[in-house]
Amino acid sequence: MAVVLRLSRAGTHKAPFYHVVATDSRNARDGKYLEDVGIYDPTKRPERIELKVERIEHWLKAGAKPSQTVAMILKRAAKAAAPAAPKA
């Protein structure tokens, strides 16, 4: 079973938000998933990104591959969570 981290669409017509899920790569986009590991809402300003970092790390260590979009979201969330470097 090839596990991937990808987005599953939720919300209403013209007002989507997405769940970040761990799922088998053969399942449909909005089909069954193994675990819900976060939320991404691009319609809010600033964008709403809530991730269960420990669970995402678990799935990545177990061999899950993130989709391109999820990889971008993870980088953006890591950058936002990192403390700003002090200016010398």
Swiss-Prot record:
What GO molecular functions are on record for this protein?
structural constituent of ribosome
- Keyword Zinc listed? The answer is no
Report the Pfam families cross-referenced here.
Answer: Ribosomal_S16 (PF00886)
- What are the entry keywords? Ribonucleoprotein, Ribosomal protein
- One biological process GO term for this chain? translation
This protein's GO cellular component annotations are: cytoplasm; small ribosomal subunit
Q: Which family does it belong to?
A: Belongs to the bacterial ribosomal protein bS16 family.
What PANTHER family would the database entry show? 30S RIBOSOMAL PROTEIN S16, SMALL RIBOSOMAL SUBUNIT PROTEIN BS16M
Specify the protein name.
Answer: Small ribosomal subunit protein bS16
Native organism: Anaeromyxobacter dehalogenans (strain 2CP-C)
What's the gene?
rpsP
